């Protein structure tokens, strides 16, 4: 049913703001802060995003017209936000999820954004987000927690 399709089964049952999370995600974050951000900004959806930094192991080149060099940057680091798979939704959005079809959270977010609904992004640090769907990260988290 996709990452959001099964939520259509809750249409008449959920009356309050709800957290939704992919099953293989952990974040080290005070969830009450995320909820406070969501409510203060009157968002319909809040996406929890992790900040990521990746060093590029090569020099990069930016060019202009006719292939002219504009800038040469040696081994830059790029920074961006990624979707962690954790969301806060207002209950009326459950009515926007079609029944009995594959439907993803990303599509719901795009639909809300397209109609100018309020979609917020709550950033968390790179280290606070754990994707335990990745075996290396899963093992690292199990090992780390067993030594505490």
Which functions belong to the PLM regions below?
Residues 41-51:
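A short, conserved acidic/glycine-rich loop-to-beta-strand motif
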Residues 18-19, 26, 32-39, 52-55, ...:
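Catalytic-core segments of class I nucleotidyltransferases/pyrophosphorylases
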Residues 1-19:
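Short phosphate-binding loop-to-helix
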Residues 47, 60, 86-88:
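Conserved hydrophobic/aromatic beta-strand scaffold that supports enzyme active sites
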Residues 6, 30-31:
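Residues at alpha-helix caps and immediate loop-helix transition turns in enzyme cores, especially N-
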Residues 59-69:
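Conserved catalytic core of nucleotide-sugar-dependent glycosyltransferases
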Residues 8-9, 61-62, 135-140:
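Short, surface-exposed amphipathic charged segments that create phosphate/polyanion-binding patches used
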